[in-house]
A protein has these predicted regions:
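Bacterial Sec-exported substrate-binding components of ABC uptake systems
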Residues: 2-59, 160-192, 252, 306-316
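Structured C-terminal subdomain patch of bacterial secreted/periplasmic proteins
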Residues: 28, 147, 155, 164, ...
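Short helix-initiation/N-cap motifs at beta->coil->alpha
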Residues: 39-41, 92-103, 226-237
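Short, solvent-exposed loop/turn elements at domain surfaces
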Residues: 44-46, 61-66, 80-83, 197-203, ...
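Extracytoplasmic/secreted envelope proteins and their assembly/folding machinery
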Residues: 47-50, 57-68, 102, 106, ...
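A short, structured surface patch at a secondary-structure boundary
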Residues: 55-108, 112-118, 217-220
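His/Asp/Glu-enriched short active-site or ligand-binding loop at hydrolase and phosphoryl-transfer sites
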Residues: 82, 209-229
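Extracytoplasmic ligand-binding site segments that recognize negatively charged/polar headgroups
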Residues: 120-124, 136-152, 186-211, 258
Length: 316
C-alpha cells in the first residue's frame, strides 16, 4: 500500500513538473523575439506576441483596428474612418504623424512601435532601440501592400483568423470590381498631388497610381523620362500637353480648399491646359481626401470604385 501511495505521489510530482515546464516554455515562447523585415529593408526583432503596440500613423492603425487589434497609443489625426472611431477613441495620443512625441510614446511602455517610412519616424529608431523598443516601419503604397499589412498585423495582434476573413472579403470585392475592366479601353489618366509647396504627378509607385493601373488606366506620369522608381515627379505642363490625358484626377494634401483652388486657377489661366482633352471635355475630378490623401487601408475598394466611376462612368 505504501509503495502504491509513493508511486501515486511520484506521478503527481512528475505531472506537476511537466505542466510547470510546459507553462514556462509557453511563456518564454510568447516573449521570444522573431526577426522580420520592414518596408525599409531593416531587420527588426519584435516580440512573438506584442502586447503593447503604439502606432505613429493612421493608415497602419486603421488596418490593425479593423481586425480587432488593440493598440496602447495612436497618432493625433482627423483621418480615421467612422467604423473604427469608437474602438480607438480612448487610446492615448502620441502626436501628429510628422511630430511624434517620444516622451509620450515611452510613457506608454510599448513593446513595439509601428510607423511608416518618413523621416519623422525613421529618426526614432535609435532612441527607441536604446530603450529596448523595436520600431517597425510599414509603407502601404499599393493594393498588395494592404493585403500584406492585414496578414502582418493579424500576426501581431494574434488575430490571424480575423485577418484572413478581412483579406478574403477585400479580395472578393476586388475581383468583382475589376473583372469587367477590358484591355483596349485604356483611358489616359493624369493624377496630380497638390501640396502647399508643389504640384506633382503620381506614378504607378504611388497608391493612387497603383489603383489606376489595376483599373486599366494608362498613367501618363509613367512615361516621363525622370520617373525611375519615384512615387511622384514634378508636374510638367509641356509633358502634359504632349501626352494629352483624357482624365485628370486631383488629390490635395489634407483636402485643402486653397490648394484645390490654386490648381483650378492654374487650369483656367494657363493656356496650355485649354487644349488638354480632360479640360476640354470637363473630366477633371477631385478625389476625396478621406480615401486618397491618407491611405484608405481596408477601404481601398471604396477608393477604387470612385476611380472606376470617373474613368468609365461605372463602379459595379
Amino acid at each position: 500500500m505504501k509503495k502504491y501511495i509513493l508511486l501515486v505521489f511520484v506521478v503527481i510530482i512528475a505531472l506537476a513538473g511537466y505542466f510547470l515546464l510546459a507553462r514556462g516554455q509557453h511563456k518564454l515562447a510568447a516573449n521570444a523575439a522573431v526577426s522580420v523585415t520592414d518596408s525599409t529593408g531593416a531587420k527588426v526583432h519584435i516580440p512573438a506576441e506584442p502586447k503593447r503596440i503604439v502606432f505613429l500613423n493612421a493608415s497602419n492603425l486603421e488596418i490593425f483596428a479593423s481586425i480587432g487589434g488593440k493598440a496602447v497609443g495612436r497618432p493625433t489625426s482627423t483621418s480615421y474612418p467612422d467604423d473604427i472611431k469608437e474602438s480607438i477613441k480612448d487610446i492615448p495620443e502620441v502626436g501628429m504623424i510628422h511630430a511624434p512625441n517620444l516622451e509620450k510614446i515611452m510613457s506608454l511602455k510599448p513593446d513595439l512601435v509601428v510607423g511608416t517610412n518618413v523621416p519623422f519616424h525613421v529618426m526614432l529608431r535609435k532612441p527607441l532601440e536604446m530603450a529596448g523598443v523595436p520600431l517597425y516601419l510599414n509603407m502601404i503604397n499599393s493594393y498588395e501592400d494592404v493585403l500584406k499589412s492585414i496578414d502582418d498585423f493579424g500576426r501581431f495582434a494574434g488575430r490571424e483568423k480575423e485577418a484572413a476573413a478581412k483579406r478574403a472579403q477585400i479580395e472578393k470585392e476586388y475581383a468583382a470590381l475589376t473583372q469587367d475592366v477590358q484591355k483596349g479601353r485604356d483611358p489616359k489618366v493624369l493624377i496630380i498631388f497638390g501640396s502647399p509647396d508643389s504640384f506633382n504627378m503620381s506614378t504607378k509607385k504611388s497608391f493612387g497610381g497603383d489603383l489606376a493601373e489595376r483599373l486599366g488606366a494608362v498613367n501618363i506620369a509613367d512615361k516621363a523620362e525622370n520617373v525611375k522608381d519615384s512615387s511622384y515627379i514634378p508636374l510638367s505642363m509641356e509633358f502634359v500637353a504632349k501626352e494629352n490625358p483624357d482624365i485628370v484626377m486631383l488629390i490635395t494634401m489634407g483636402g485643402s480648399k486653397e490648394i484645390l483652388e490654386k490648381l483650378r486657377a492654374n487650369m483656367r489661366d494657363n493656356a496650355i491646359w485649354h487644349d488638354v482633352n480632360a479640360v476640354k471635355n470637363n473630366r477633371v475630378y477631385q478625389l476625396p481626401p478621406s480615401l486618397f490623401t491618407v491611405n484608405p487601408g481596408t477601404h481601398t475598394i471604396d477608393a477604387m470604385k470612385i476611380m472606376k466611376e470617373y474613368m468609365y462612368g461605372e463602379a459595379k
